[in-house]
């Protein structure tokens, strides 16, 4: 059975924290690859102004293109409405019955697991992998595999705020992503 990691998110923008988490879990669990799963509309972010799918996808491609064990999975982008992990993983497990999926989540999402849509059924489809995130614990009533990663306190919301305030984001996200953001005037207001 193949072992594949999945890291979902809006990736608005993708940053070194996402890449660090994916790479650390890839090595710690001896995965075949890690798939980045950009959301259409995450249920917990409905109503927030999210950068276009096209721009988020382009930035994610730029961020991951140099790692042969990273891929982008477009499963959620093909659907309209909220992106529920259960629906996505049900589709992916049907398409790839030979794969054991390891769904990678940060401490913020570990704490939120009791509120996830169809969590009990989702546990039959994936192994959750929790990684520590500053300010959050990995305590949950659900079974998760934990992977220790070096602390890197950066988030997409922090980066959007820094761009809005015209502060440097150098060394926080890949240079190609920075160039794309600046050329397209993203996060300026």
Swiss-Prot record:
Keywords: ATP-binding, NAD, Nucleotide-binding, Nucleotidyltransferase, Pyridine nucleotide biosynthesis, Transferase. It catalyses: nicotinate beta-D-ribonucleotide + ATP + H(+) = deamido-NAD(+) + diphosphate. GO terms for molecular function: ATP binding; nicotinate-nucleotide adenylyltransferase activity. It is an enzyme of class 2 (transferase). The gene is nadD. SUPFAM superfamilies: Nucleotidylyl transferase. It comes from the Bacteria. It comes from Bacillus cereus (strain ATCC 10987 / NRS 248). GO terms for biological process: NAD biosynthetic process. This is Probable nicotinate-nucleotide adenylyltransferase. Belongs to the NadD family.
């Amino acid at each position: 059975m193949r072992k594949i990691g999945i890291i979902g998110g809006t990736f608005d923008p993708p940053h070194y924290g996402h890449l660090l988490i994916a790479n650390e879990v890839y090595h710690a669990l001896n995965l075949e690859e890690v798939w980045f799963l950009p959301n259409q509309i995450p249920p917990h972010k409905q109503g927030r102004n999210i950068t276009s799918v096209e721009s988020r996808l382009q930035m994610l491609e730029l961020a991951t293109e140099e790692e042969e064990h990273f891929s982008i999975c477009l499963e959620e982008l093909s659907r309209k409405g909220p992106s529920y992990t259960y629906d996505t993983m049900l589709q992916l497990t049907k398409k790839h019955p030979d794969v054991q999926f390891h769904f990678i989540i940060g401490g913020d999402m570990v704490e939120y697991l009791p509120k996830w849509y169809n969590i009990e059924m989702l546990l039959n489809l994936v192994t959750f992998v929790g990684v520590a995130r500053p300010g959050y614990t990995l305590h949950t009533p659900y079974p998760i595999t934990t992977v220790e990663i070096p602390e890197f306190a950066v988030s997409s919301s922090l980066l959007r705020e820094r761009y809005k305030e015209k502060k440097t984001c150098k060394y926080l996200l890949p240079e190609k992503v920075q160039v794309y953001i600046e050329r397209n005037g993203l996060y300026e207001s």
